[in-house]
């Protein structure tokens, strides 16, 4: 059986924070907020990265199916940057075939800051980057 998902290719950037960090940055605990590149960089400059992993809801589901034994693939758009490389390597490690046209993009690879407070609540700040710009030209139908 083969299953292919298409979605936003997002690198999850996991950081531990306290409630004060959320308040100081006007973030609502346990919510997800779409942010631009400027806000992403502003937040990231004040954080210590714990871990980065390939993410995005569709890709996460495809990885789960792969772990259950399905032959799985994912279509999503990343840039030819460090995070884009990390994203494709992460899917490969999970035995997910990744279909994409690797090229330099104007926008960087999409990222989601996952801010974890001491009570294990997650607050997410997502910058879609190039993931939000996927189009027909990015999909290789012959693959």
PLM region spans:
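Short hydrophobic segments within beta-strands
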Residues: 6-7, 75-77, 116-118, 125
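Short secondary-structure boundary/capping elements
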Residues: 53-60, 83, 105-108, 131-136
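A glycine-rich helix N-cap at a beta->alpha junction
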Residues: 90-107
């Amino acid at each position: 059986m083969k299953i292919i998902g298409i979605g936003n290719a997002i690198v999850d950037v996991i950081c531990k924070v306290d409630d004060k960090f959320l308040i100081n940055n006007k973030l609502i605990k346990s919510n997800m907020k779409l942010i631009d590149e400027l806000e992403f960089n502003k937040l990231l400059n004040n954080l210590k990265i714990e871990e980065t992993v390939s993410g995005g809801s569709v890709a996460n589901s495809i990885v789960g199916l792969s772990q259950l034994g399905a032959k799985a693939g994912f279509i999503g758009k990343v840039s030819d940057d460090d995070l884009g490389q990390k994203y494709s390597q992460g899917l490969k490690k999970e035995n997910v075939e990744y279909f994409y046209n690797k090229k330099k993009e104007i926008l960087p690879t999409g990222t989601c800051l996952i801010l974890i407070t001491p009570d294990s609540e997650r607050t997410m700040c997502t910058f879609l980057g190039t993931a939000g710009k996927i189009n027909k030209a990015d999909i290789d139908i012959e693959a």
